Each structure stands twice: as C-alpha cells, then as structure tokens.
Amino acid sequence: VEENLRMALLGCGRADRIDDALELFPALKGLLGRKGGVLSGGEQQQLAIGRALLTRPKVLMLDEPTEGIQPSIVMEIEDSIRRIASELGLAVLLVEQYLDFAERLADAYVIMAKGAVVAAGVTSELRLETVKHHLSL
C-alpha cells in the first residue's frame, strides 16, 4: 500500500505528502504494510481516495465511492470526504447511485438520463418524486 502511494507521487517530488495524506485520511494508516492485492473493496476505495489527495487537487472527483463497500465503511468514507473537503477547501464532484449518501455530501445535484441533464438544483430541495420519475425513464 505504501509503495502504491509513493508511485502516485512520481514526478511530483513530494514524498512528504504521504504523511499529509495519512493525517488527512487516517483510515490509510491501517493499510500500510499490506499488499494491495489483499485489500477489500472498501480498503481499495480508501487507497484510491488517498492517492488522489496526494496531488493536492482543487476538485476531488469520486465515481461511485460507495460501490461494493460495507455500510460501516461508507460512514467512515463519508466523514472523511466531508472533513477533507472542508479542511482543504476542495470541491467534490460525486457520481453516486445511492441518494442518501449523495444528499448528505452534496450541496447541489444534477440528474442525468441517457447522457442529458434532466434535473438539477439545490440538494436540500431535491424531491424523491423527481428522482423516481427520472429513474423510471
């Protein structure tokens, strides 16, 4: 796992950022010393987020970060994403199929169907009827 993180920094010349990523995303500390091939889906997702943070992005793009992850780990990832975005001032672009997870993290939403935007707005105003209508298209 540590080698995986170091490889993400090649060309960036900032090995000290691994320590920064471990501080920001403590779940990674428990993965150090393990082989990547034995990580669970949730652990792999945590490693992927940690790698993304190493480059200090302005936008963190997450595609289905809860896919195949145990509910207990989903809450850890959600808390970490929220905290990291706040501490680093990151914008988070989230592609997510689970509405409850997306609602808790997002300020705004866009619903797409067949490659087109079919609904958009402020998450606090998102109505279940809107989602159900577009899911049935």
Name what the model sees in each region.
Residues 52-53:
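ABC ATPase C-loop
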Residues 96-97:
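H-loop/switch region of ABC-family ATPase nucleotide-binding domains
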Residues 60-64:
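Catalytic Walker B motif of ABC-type/P-loop ATPase nucleotide-binding domains
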Residues 56:
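Conserved catalytic motifs of ABC-family nucleotide-binding domains
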Residues 1-18, 25-29, 121:
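ABC-type ATPase nucleotide-binding domains, specifically the catalytic core motifs of the NBD
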Residues 35-39, 43:
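Conserved ABC ATPase signature
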Residues 75-88:
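Helical segment within the ABC ATPase nucleotide-binding domain
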